[in-house]
Each structure stands twice: as C-alpha cells, then as structure tokens.
Regions:
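Active-site phosphate-binding strand-loop segment of PLP-dependent enzymes
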Residues: 147, 151-203
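Structural motif of enzymes handling amino- and sulfur-group chemistry
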Residues: 270-289, 308-309
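Short loop-beta-helix segment that forms the pyridoxal 5′-phosphate
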Residues: 75-79, 90-113
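PLP-dependent enzyme catalytic core of the Aspartate aminotransferase-like
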Residues: 55, 59-63, 67, 90, ...
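Conserved PLP-anchoring active-site segment centered on the Schiff-base-forming lysine
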Residues: 114-133, 154
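Active-site PLP attachment segment
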Residues: 215, 221-257
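N-terminal glycine-rich, Lys/His-bearing helix-loop that initiates the first secondary-structure elements
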Residues: 1-94, 192-198, 329, 359, ...
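Conserved PLP-binding catalytic core of the aspartate aminotransferase-like
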Residues: 295-301, 310-342, 353, 358, ...
Length: 390
C-alpha cells in the first residue's frame, strides 16, 4: 500500500510513548490558562516577560490595524514592505546595536533560509549537538558538510575546525540560550574559536532576546560582547516579546544578499503590518521595562533554591527554562499528568526532541508568576516524583 509508513510510524510513536497532539487553549496566554473548561497554572509558556496578553500590546495591534490595515498584500519586494516594516527594522538596529536587519515570518524559516542560502557542497557547517531542530534539519538537507560538536565543548569545536583548515567557507552555529536545556552558550569562547579558524559565527538567540543582557539585548550582550561582534545574529519575536515572527541581522552586504538571493524571503508574503507595529511596541517595552526582567530573575532564583531544598533533579540552567530531568518517556508523561491533575500545566519533553533517556519536564517561568505559585509547584513536583518512585 502506498505511503503505508504513515500508519506504521504513528503506531510506533504511540507504542514508545512518544505520540504528540495539540491541545486547544481557551482564551488568552496568561499565568492561568483554560483547557477543556479547567484552569491551570501555566508553567509551559515562552512568554517570559508576560507581554503576550498585555493590554498595551493588545491596543498596539488594534492601532496598527487602524493605521496600516491587516495584511501586507504581497511579498517584501513587491507591495508587502510597509513603512512600519522599515521603521521597526531601524528600531531593532538601534536597540540591539545591529548594522542591518531583515524580517522573517518565523525563526524556523529564517534558520532554514540562511543555511540554504549561504552554504554549498564545498562548505562546512558546524553546529552544537543540541541546537534547535530548525538548524539541525536545515543542515541535514544542505549540500554542505555538517559536523556537530559536543554541547558547549570548545575543545571539540576547535578540533573540528582545525581539521578543516583548507575549507574556505565555514559557519559555526549555536543557540544563545538552549531551548530544551536552558543553559547558555559560551559566546566569547565561540567567537575566539571562529576568529582563530577564520569561520563565521551565527547565534540563534530566540530564548535570550528580551530576557538577558542590558536592556534585554540578549545573550551576546549579557556576556560582555556586542551583537554586532557575531557575523549573524537572529532572534524571534514570539518568546519574550510575546508576538511572533523573527529577524536576521548582519552586515549590510549580507542583508542585501538575503534580499536578492533568499527564495524563502523573496517569495513569502510580508508579515502583517499591524503585527509589525505591535512588535515595535513590544520591543520598546522589553527594552525599557527592566522590572519585568528583575521580577523574572528573582523567581528563577527562588525556583532553583526550593528545588535544591526538595532535591528535585534540575538540569544546570540560570534562565527561565528550568528542566526537571526524569529519564524515561513514560515516566515524564506520568509526572506531567500528575501535575495536570493537580492544576499545573507542564509539558513532558521526549525524544526525538531530546536524547533518549533524557525525557524531562520543561518548566518555564515568566514575570507573571508569583512566589506562592512556585512554592506549590515545587512541592507537587516532589510529590509526583516520590509517588512514581523515580
């Protein structure tokens, strides 16, 4: 039978406790969410600064629609590039210290577009082993040779680059904050390796922008560098900024090259101008409202302190992403379901998103949480682990 693999692979996923399905959330993204008529404390959202449903942004989207309409009407090189797109790219350049910026519909499409555009069969792509799926998949289907270095292992990275000295075009990619582990890349060491071996460095800062660094400028700035010190800096607007879409930055020449040669950019309808106006307002709030980061940092420290007290097996992270390592996929599902029954929305992350044997609860904190939320959550996690003998 044609395409029989579809049913076979779905059955296999279910047997391995790896099957997934979307769950519809009623209402707004917030501290509490509603699913099937029941309310849950939400510890699975990437809305780190609590902006996704902020009234200021809701009104900004409405105002953007009044000013610019809803749809962009075309691709960026035809009629889809509104003045608001231009203004927001300028705003991002000034806020983040970037030379040039181009907008994309999503971080996934931005990463896929860049790797496809820049690398050919004679080139080398080197990635951190646990980079985001958008980066790994793009590398796998690229004509370039791809090698992956052990997570944050600069010695391994150096040995790979040293073995490829005669390759002219070398691109090293790392996430700034790793989406499933929550730890950060050693940006200075990465830059040093790339400089020494004449390679370009790209940082995907989807989970660092808005949260880390002075004025929320991200992971690179948090580590005492400038965003312009890396060859390519990209990030998204759908995490800390609470909206959606993404951007890529680099030299003016690189952005000009994307404008002229990147098919995913050229042949995609531009981001809705009302949405882009809202992104601009979100960027302003992320830059200026330091209290959101201060509150989030305090909650992160509190969660880590309580988890240590209750001997909960956290992975090493100082960011809003706090993974609780469980191990087996069925065990992670059991703990997640236990917490849902107690009124906490937590997500079990399983292979192939993470390595076999490293299934986990991906706890994410936001500035909207209260200390008492965390106190109850940590106690329930402890009870869930004890009840299931993990």
């Amino acid at each position: 039978m044609a395409f029989s693999f579809i049913a076979e692979q779905l059955a296999q996923r279910k047997q391995q406790h790896l099957h997934r399905a979307s769950v519809a959330i009623t209402g707004k993204q917030a501290r509490y969410i509603e699913v099937n008529g029941k309310h849950y404390l939400n510890f699975s959202s990437n809305d780190y600064l609590g902006l996704a449903s902020d009234p200021l942004l809701v009104n900004a989207w409405k105002k953007g629609a009044d000013l610019f309409g809803i749809g962009s009407g075309g691709s960026y090189l035809v009629t889809g590039y509104n003045k608001v797109h231009h203004d927001v790219t300028q705003q991002l350049q000034e806020w983040l210290g970037l030379e040039a910026v181009v907008l994309f519909s999503s971080g996934y499409s931005a990463n896929q577009a860049l790797i496809k555009l820049l690398l050919s069969k004679d080139d080398l792509l080197v990635q951190d082993k646990i980079n985001h799926a958008s980066l790994i998949e793009a590398g796998a289907i690229s004509a370039a040779k791809m090698q992956r270095f052990k997570h944050n292992d600069m010695q391994h990275l150096g040995s790979i680059l040293n073995s490829q000295q005669h390759t002219e075009n070398k691109l090293v990619i790392s996430e700034g904050v790793f989406s499933m582990d929550g730890d950060s890349a050693p940006i200075n060491a990465l830059k040093q390796q790339c400089t020494e071996h004449k390679a370009w460095l790209m940082i995907d800062d989807a989970h660092g922008l808005g949260v880390l660094g002075k004025e929320g400028k991200g992971t690179v700035v948090d580590q005492q560098l400038n965003n312009s010190d890396v060859n390519i800096y990209m990030a998204t607007f759908g995490k800390a900024l609470g909206v959606g879409g993404a951007f890529v930055s680099g030299s003016s020449q690189l952005i000009d090259y994307i404008n002229n040669f990147s098919k995913p950019y050229i042949y995609t309808t531009g981001l809705p101008p009302a949405m882009v106006y809202c992104i601009g307002q979100a960027a302003h709030l992320a830059q200026t409202q330091q209290w959101r980061r201060d509150q989030l940092d305090e909650l992160i420290r509190y969660f880590k302190h309580l988890s240590a007290h209750y001997e909960i097996p956290l992975m090493p992270s100082n960011t809003a992403i706090q993974p609780v390592l469980i191990g087996a996929s069925d065990a992670a599902l059991a703990v997640s379901q236990y917490l849902k029954d107690k009124g906490f929305w937590t997500t079990a992350i399983r292979p192939p998103t993470v390595a076999n044997g490293s299934a986990r609860l991906r706890i994410t904190l936001t500035s909207q949480h209260l200390k008492q939320d965390i106190e109850i959550l940590v106690k329930q996690i402890k009870q869930a682990i004890d009840a299931n003998n993990f």
